[in-house]
């Protein structure tokens, strides 16, 4: 018996996948996207697993669901889905979703070139540019980002003692900068980063507590951001972001870029109004910028923006059938 039919549009943002679910997800209860996120996880998480996990997805698959706006001033809402769960915010996911939604007329903007979007982390503003029927760039004015914990020392098997920072940019990130026991991203293979990252995330999660002061459902360290020397002309810095159980972001990571700009600002390395060009593990670039300064629960925070591009590459209809023994997906760990 068929459990559900889902109409999807597949794209990638600077190399990282975005599967937009354009139809098939039932209405979600809740007044805010934070509430709708919790409702989805409690009642419809099988949809996420079926569409993100193998055999229909893979360990790096991520996606989104476009929903009606929660706020009167918003154009639409976005629910972010990926192998690890439903993120409060996703930068590359927003860029891919906006590109796909505008090109396929899934969202009708109140103002051409500008969207207000409700997301679980809050409300964001997005500007986009077009050439003909194509969206050529998307700029996100993200939620406030801040340095949550500084100089956290942990012992990591296979690495030794390292000192890290934890910053919020829509998700909580462990940021590992070059030091005595970590020479920099350029000295490690992707396989080595994948092996070390879960150990770092677990150790830091035990050492510090991360709960967003404005929404306690946004909690816990979810990503590990490894830094290194840039290789692309014009890049300020390079990173590799680990998420889920065994995924490395192919894009420069939007919320990670926001978190890293917050870290740099807190340490006096980046000022309001300055640009930050972030390079991914495959060499793709996001253009970041500190648009202003604000506060989160009395703590200094930045107002970050991230700009990038996405490419739509296909439409597909996915059936989830109860008679399929792998109807709800699987992970090989």
Swiss-Prot record:
Family matches, as Gene3D superfamilies: Diaminopimelate Epimerase, Chain A, domain 1
Fetch the SUPFAM superfamilies from UniProt. Diaminopimelate epimerase-like
Q: State the superkingdom.
A: Bacteria
GO MF assignments? 4-hydroxyproline epimerase activity
User: What Pfam families does the record point to?
Assistant: Pro_racemase
Looking up InterPro entries in the UniProt record yields: Pro_racemase_fam
Q: State the similarity comment.
A: Belongs to the proline racemase family.
The protein in question is named Uncharacterized protein VP1330
Organism per entry: Vibrio parahaemolyticus serotype O3:K6 (strain RIMD 2210633)
């Amino acid at each position: 018996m068929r459990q559900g039919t889902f109409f999807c549009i597949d794209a990638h943002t600077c190399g990282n996948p975005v599967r937009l679910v354009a139809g098939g997800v039932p209405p979600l209860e809740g007044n805010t996207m934070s509430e709708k996120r919790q409702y989805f996880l409690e009642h419809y998480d099988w949809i996420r697993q079926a569409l993100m996990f193998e055999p229909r997805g893979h360990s790096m698959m991520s996606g989104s669901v476009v929903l009606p706006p929660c706020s009167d001033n918003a154009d639409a809402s976005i629910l972010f889905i990926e192998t690890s769960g439903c993120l409060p915010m996703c930068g590359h996911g927003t860029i891919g979703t906006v590109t796909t939604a505008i090109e396929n007329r899934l969202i009708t903007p109140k103002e051409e070139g500008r969207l207000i979007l409700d997301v679980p982390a809050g409300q964001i503003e997005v500007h986009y540019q077009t050439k003909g029927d194509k969206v050529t760039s998307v700029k996100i004015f993200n939620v406030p980002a801040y340095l949550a914990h500084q100089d956290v020392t942990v012992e990591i098997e296979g690495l030794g003692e390292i000192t890290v920072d934890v910053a919020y940019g829509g998700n909580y990130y462990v940021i590992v900068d070059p030091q005595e026991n970590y020479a920099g991203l350029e000295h490690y293979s992707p396989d080595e980063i994948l092996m070390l990252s879960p150990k770092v995330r677990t150790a830091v999660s035990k050492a510090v507590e991360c709960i967003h002061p404005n929404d306690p459902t946004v909690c816990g360290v979810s990503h590990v951001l490894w830094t290194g020397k840039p290789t692309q002309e014009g890049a300020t810095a390079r990173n590799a972001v680990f998420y889920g159980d065994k995924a490395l972001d192919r894009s420069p990571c939007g919320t990670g870029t926001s978190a890293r700009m917050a870290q740099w600002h807190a340490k006096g390395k980046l000022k309001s109004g300055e640009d930050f060009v972030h390079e991914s593990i495959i060499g793709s670039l996001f253009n970041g910028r500190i648009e202003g300064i604000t506060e989160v629960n009395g703590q200094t925070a930045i107002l970050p923006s991230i700009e990038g591009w996405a490419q739509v590459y296909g439409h597909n209809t996915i059936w989830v059938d109860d008679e399929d023994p792998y109807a709800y997906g699987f992970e090989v760990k």
